[in-house]
Amino acid sequence: KRQVLVIGGGTGFYFYQRQQPRKAVENFLDSMKKMDFNTMESMIQSSDLTALDNADIRDAAYTDFFSEINKKMTYKITRNRFDIQNGTASVTAHITYIDGTNIYKATITEFLRQIVSNAYAGNQLTEEETQAKLASILNEQAKKVEKDVFSETDITYPVIKTDSGWKIVSLDDETVKIMSANFKSVEEEINNSLNNMDNEDSSGSSSNAPEASADDTLNLTT
């Protein structure tokens, strides 16, 4: 009888431990939906979320937009590969998230149109005013969307057991892409477009604002 209890206890311990990596990933993904950066940071072994800043996700100017986008994300854990001896696991999540490609393209086109209009009128905005205008247009374009467009992806998170519990090893690029609705940085694309306009002006070309059509592929990498 005692042997049965020992075996039963060992099995129970194993299944309990097996669920911990899964719960860690679920906690991380739930905090993504809520834009709870403190919890996200606590669930990352390196505690490094700087990639979110590179995508402007933690910029206060865009909080409303990204909060609205990320709360619509859903997920389902589809696989949990667990190694109790090494204290490691690989947890796969199937994630459905907002694809903001058309929102960004419409925002960039409208923003550049207004910038050119202000330039012709002799109005020069400060950096703060420019960012506020961009954030406002982004929110306006998001509200105009009649039906949300979703994308799906599978991410396998490497998870490791630490002294303070199970942690995801590091923040990956795909997760950042999800949180930013499929783009790395709208500000970077704006800067690239403005630089292109400056080059056109210096070469004597037309200074009309370029349009981002529905078929364009915007490259937001440096």
Protein language model features and the residues they cover:
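Short solvent-exposed beta->alpha transition segments
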Residues: E41-Q124, L138
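Extracellular, surface-exposed passenger/stalk and repeat segments of large secreted bacterial proteins
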Residues: S31, M35-S42, L171, V176-I178
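Solvent-exposed, acidic/flexible segments
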Residues: R18-P21, K33, A55-D59, D148-E152
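Short, aromatic-enriched amphipathic alpha-helices that serve as compact interaction elements
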Residues: Q17-D36, S193
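Juxtamembrane cytosolic interface motif at the C-terminal end of transmembrane helices
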Residues: G10-Q17
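Hydrophobic membrane-insertion alpha-helices, especially the h-region
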Residues: K1-G10
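Short beta-strand edge/turn micro-motifs at domain boundaries
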Residues: E110-A132, K143-S203, T217
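Long, low-complexity, intrinsically disordered segments
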Residues: S207-T222
